[in-house]
């Protein structure tokens, strides 16, 4: 609940830029206009300030004329790469203070996000029998998600004590990580989920580049534990590489989609790993028993969650109605990735069972 989060943070959610930077359009409000920033997310947040194109948008010839309005505030979400960037700017990185206030964790997958209040059909823009665009949108979402997660990692690595909390005056003299885990670790875990999916993307469309991806990722992972400057450098370098890759992804066909799906469903043991910071518990701990008190609620299951969402996005384009045969396995998988009671072995078994039925 936004009001509760704001109260914990000591801010007004209807006026604070901490909230409105993502929950309101990024444009100045015209004097005397009817719109109020406190109205929250509206059409213009995703499509751009509409003053100079709204009337044209209602005309029959909009599809033929919309390119004329790109310089007048209209944001072209028909370009899948631009759409991914538009969504990722608010749905990947998150301010630690907001997390501490109770904001739910983010898990970015573009195809799933696009189903919420969906009011368009991408296939309408294509020939009648064209292959689904969902695999292409999924792939671009993962590449963009990884790039944004690496930028978050870079920012946190550059901050004082690996925390990037020095931007807040009340944290400036604190060494929070002496008692708490480093925030850069959270960014790394979030990035890992996207990295595993980008590996699957390259398996489908550019298998020869997987070694490049692995080398860059291993460099980031090696630098994070002890070298903030190197972690920032490696993260920035990999983010730049991904920016180039983003522009090289064309329409993904069914064969490539099947390769991506197979890579994911055959990698259960690799994907099931849910890394977390060191945790220990006193034998006389009074921790509330959520399921098993030795398993903290903050398990980050980025890889498993991304795998489940990926199968949902890719399955029907890849194998059609055969997806229905794996319905029960996917339900079991969803149950296994409950953040309050993650079951890695159940996840691995269910993804393998699903994969066997989808080959």
Residue ranges of each PLM-predicted region?
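Primarily the internal scaffold of c-type cytochrome electron-transfer domains
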Residues: 1-6, 31-41, 45, 49-302
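A cross-kingdom marker for long, charged
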Residues: 289-359
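General secretory precursor processing signal
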Residues: 22-25, 46, 90, 318, ...
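Mid-chain, structured segments of secreted extracytoplasmic proteins
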Residues: 2-32
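A broadly tuned preference for mixed-charge, low-complexity surface segments
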Residues: 13-25, 87-92, 223-230, 356-359
């Amino acid at each position: 609940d936004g009001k509760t989060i704001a109260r914990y943070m000591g801010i007004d959610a209807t006026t604070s830029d901490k909230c409105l930077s993502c929950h309101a359009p990024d444009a100045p409000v015209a004097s005397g206009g009817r719109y109020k920033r406190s109205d929250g997310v509206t059409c213009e947040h995703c499509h751009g300030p509409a003053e100079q194109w709204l009337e044209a948008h209602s005309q029959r010839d909009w599809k033929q004329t919309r390119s004329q309005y790109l310089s007048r505030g209209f944001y072209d979400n028909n370009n899948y790469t631009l759409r991914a960037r538009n969504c990722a700017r608010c749905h990947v990185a998150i301010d630690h203070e907001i997390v501490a206030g109770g904001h739910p964790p983010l898990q970015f997958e573009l195809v799933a996000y696009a189903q919420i209040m969906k009011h368009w059909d991408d296939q309408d823009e294509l020939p009648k029998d064209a292959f689904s665009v969902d695999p292409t949108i999924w792939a671009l979402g993962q590449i963009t998600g990884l790039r944004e997660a690496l930028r978050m990692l870079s920012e946190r690595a550059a901050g004082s004590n690996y925390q990037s909390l020095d931007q807040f005056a009340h944290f400036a003299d604190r060494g929070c990580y002496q008692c708490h885990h480093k925030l850069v670790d959270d960014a790394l875990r979030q990035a890992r989920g996207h990295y595993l999916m980008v590996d699957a993307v390259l398996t489908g469309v550019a298998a020869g580049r997987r070694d490049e991806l692995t080398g860059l990722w291993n460099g980031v992972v090696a630098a994070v534990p002890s070298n903030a400057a190197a972690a920032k450098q490696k993260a920035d370098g990999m983010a730049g590489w991904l920016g180039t890759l983003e522009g090289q992804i064309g329409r993904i066909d069914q064969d490539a989609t099947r390769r991506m799906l197979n890579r994911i469903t055959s990698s259960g043991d690799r994907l099931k790993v849910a890394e977390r910071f060191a945790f220990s518990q006193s034998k006389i701990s009074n921790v509330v028993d959520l399921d098993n008190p030795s398993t903290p609620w903050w398990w980050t299951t980025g890889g498993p969650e991304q795998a489940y969402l990926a199968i949902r996005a890719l399955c029907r384009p890849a194998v059609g109605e055969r997806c229905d045969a794996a319905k029960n396995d996917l339900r079991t998988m969803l149950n296994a990735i409950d953040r309050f009671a993650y079951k890695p072995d159940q996840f691995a078994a269910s993804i393998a069972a699903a994969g066997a039925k989808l080959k």
